[in-house]
């Protein structure tokens, strides 16, 4: 009788264990080095940077957002004056301190130009993140 109960319990548990759990799955629309960013995270970072830009304000020692001069010659899908703003792998909004390696680039019309990173670049240069 105990054996029958164990079989019944095991039969009920197996499908429950095999069922997908509520894993924290992140959309990976862009990849900068080993960091993965969703489109909404990029949009949030861009919005934070553009709000400061349009208000004539900046934060941090490097005064972000600041103009990005595109010395690397990226072929961005939008034109205009470009500005760079840190996007943090923690998901937090940059508010000063270390900016990390990854940047959102937008123009003066608040259009996303792309994502770039210092990771894998020589010197203080940038390379393109994948996904744009």
UniProtKB/Swiss-Prot annotation:
Gene3D superfamilies attached to this UniProt entry: Microbial ribonucleases
Major subcellular site: secreted
Key words of the record: Disulfide bond, Endonuclease, Hydrolase, Lyase, Nuclease, Secreted, Signal
CDD domains: fungal_RNase (cd00606)
GO molecular function: lyase activity; ribonuclease T1 activity; RNA binding; RNA endonuclease activity
Signal peptide: 1-26
SUPFAM superfamilies: Microbial ribonucleases
Domain of life: Eukaryota
PANTHER family in alphabetical order: EXTRACELLULAR GUANYL-SPECIFIC RIBONUCLEASE RNTA (AFU_ORTHOLOGUE AFUA_4G03230) (PTHR42104:SF1)
Protein name: Guanyl-specific ribonuclease C2
Organism, as annotated: Aspergillus clavatus (strain ATCC 1007 / CBS 513.65 / DSM 816 / NCTC 3887 / NRRL 1 / QM 1276 / 107)
